């Protein structure tokens, strides 16, 4: 979920989610080092502090810089880089309307993963996770569309250990690649893109940082969120981030819980 500030999730312009072929970068550390998508425009982990201060641009139009105005209900802040964005969100600022909510997409897809990469460790054990047609049965319910009653049901299903596929049996994979998984349930389309890999939680195994979006098939509804997942010994992907901005990492528990 985005915010608890009564912000509607219907925009006048639909968010278009596409599948892109991006290269990958890895840090210079030895073995099991963190890696990330080239879309982050990051050469090394040491460059993150500077990268956080660079004004963001649109993903589809790199020449166009992005600015958003966030509010806390009393005052507003004009934001154009990740450092200011994360500071504002952590302080309780949020988009004041649907248009601003749409414009925050570039920040959601870049700022949180840069934040978490700063503290990522080399992976000590385990393999690399890639999307497959089984991923819907491994993921918890995500990007749940509907009333508060429906979203609450999704949260309860996740606590019970249900998969996204169990919670929404109509959900079907429409496209799968190494880093992008797309699905549709007949009403909404979903896209999950792996942005980075590494040990983000200190558990010693690989975690994946993911940018996920839901788009209404016949409407302009949309929602985009940031996630970190760990693969458990039961073959499930456990969500390691809170379910609303600023998507803080949860206190670390066993990956097998």
Question: Which role does the model predict for each range below?
Answer:
Residues 28-200, 211-257:
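Beta-propeller-forming repeat regions
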Residues 19-26:
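C-terminal segment of classical bacterial N-terminal signal peptides
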Residues 1, 22, 252-256:
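Intrinsic disorder/low-complexity signature
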Residues 203:
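Acidic carboxylate motifs that coordinate Ca2+ or other divalent cations, activating on Asp/Glu
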Residues 1-14:
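Bacterial N-terminal signal peptides that target proteins for export
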